[in-house]
Amino acid sequence: MVVSVKVFKKATPNGKVTFYLGRRDFIDHIDYCDPVDGVIVVEPDYLKNRKVFGQLATTYRYGREEDEVMGVKFSKELILCREQIVPMTNPNMEMTPMQEKLVRKLGSNAYPFTFHFPPNSPSSVTLQQEGDDNGKPLGVEYTIRAFVGDSEDDRQHKRSMVSLVIKKLQYAPLNRGQRLPSSLVSKGFTFSNGKISLEVTLDREIYYHGEKTAATVQVSNNSKKSVKSIKCFIVQHTEITMVNAQFSKHVAQLETKEGCPITPGANLTKTFYLIPLAANNKDRHGIALDGHLKDEDVNLASSTMVQEGKSTGDACGIVISYSVRIKLNCGTLGGEMQTDVPFKLLQPAPGTIEKKRSNAMKKMKSIEQHRNVKGYYQDDDDNIVFEDFAKMRMNNVNMAD
């Protein structure tokens, strides 16, 4: 069985410079981050003593584009690194296996490049827009671009510039650990004796996207009140560090009266299952995603991970966390009592069974979708499959229109 390798490509509007990337997602392993490695092909005799420069940039948009009036901007763009790609400043640079294969296939006009993310750079996050909002989405976005000029400070002309949006993601550690997060709260009442105790325990600390979260709820009613119903939520907490704003959204929920009312002196133990999915929150404004909702493989934004010894308060960009929230309805006079149990929602680590299964499903979908699509072709000599970059997203946009 021959395994083909997919390579994404994108050319400048004039077709003279073409980007080739082996992947769109780059992984932050906490202590190091995957480099952005690719190849640029320039048509012969096009440069005429000019050079090709490359940049890795991030755009942090924390306000709506339509609100930018009187010169006020609600976005920041930072150039994280830049370098001259053509002519090569380091002809002896070490290439990855993918770069070696592409250079061998594309010939002498192919030039490899490598960019590195700075330490502690934020992960890619997109905040879902309202249905009628066609402006640029809020969030953190990474772009690599190349342009032709005499120096790095030359004006970038659209005809000779190419840019690609990439994602910087975090994966779960290989070992999910044995810790079972839990929370225990009690509530007393002003005009009656006794308390209601609520204990919530999760079956693990780290969940993968698409997995069920299992919350075991134990209620002990030692008061004179009754518990009328139980509500269970998965809450996504978002912190926008640039403006010090925080908000929370329910990404999964259920309400039940099974086992209720819990009368005075009674106890209840029950396990609730919820699955937080981006597909179930398509029309929810402000939900944080790890990409655009039009992408076929989009997930809810992963929990923000930091190095050991640091807290998420030290992170920059958009900080994401999750919790299971249980609410007990104790009647009109008794009010509600609630508790939150935090957990982490992440991508499965490379090498795990869950990651292999996820990759296999994505590959099957990709093959089926692109079997007869123009712009997607295979080179049998080197087992390389070329796909026009962002074509899938454009197809989805056209279908939506």
Swiss-Prot record:
Q: Which GO terms describe its biological process?
A: desensitization of G protein-coupled receptor signaling pathway; G protein-coupled receptor internalization; negative regulation of opsin-mediated signaling pathway; negative regulation of phospholipase C-activating phototransduction signaling pathway; photoreceptor cell maintenance; sensory perception of smell; sensory perception of sound; signal transduction
Query: Which keywords appear in this protein's UniProt record, sorted alphabetically?
Result: Cell projection, Phosphoprotein, Sensory transduction, Vision
GO terms of molecular function: G protein-coupled receptor binding; opsin binding
Tissue specificity remark = Expressed in photoreceptor cells.
Q: Does the keyword Phosphoprotein apply?
A: yes
**GO cellular component terms listed in the entry, alphabetical order:** cytoplasm; rhabdomere; subrhabdomeral cisterna
List of residues that carry Phosphoserine: S366
Which InterPro entries would you find in this protein's record?
Arrestin (IPR000698), Arrestin-like_C (IPR014752), Arrestin-like_N (IPR011021), Arrestin_C-like (IPR011022), Arrestin_CS (IPR017864), Arrestin_N (IPR014753), Ig_E-set (IPR014756)
What post-translational modification information does the record give?
Phosphorylated upon light exposure.
What is the annotated localization of this protein?
Cell projection, Rhabdomere
Give a short account of what the protein does.
Answer: Regulates photoreceptor cell deactivation. Arr1 and Arr2 proteins are mediators of rhodopsin inactivation and are essential for the termination of the phototransduction cascade. Involved in regulating normal cycles of per nuclear accumulation in brain circadian neurons and thus is important for normal circadian behavior. In the dark, functions with Arr1 to promote the formation of cytosolic Bdbt foci, which are required for dco localization to photoreceptor nuclei where it phosphorylates and activates degradation of per.
- Family in the record: Belongs to the arrestin family.
What is this protein called in UniProt?
Answer: Phosrestin-1
Which organism's genome codes for this protein? Drosophila melanogaster
Name the encoding gene, please: Arr2
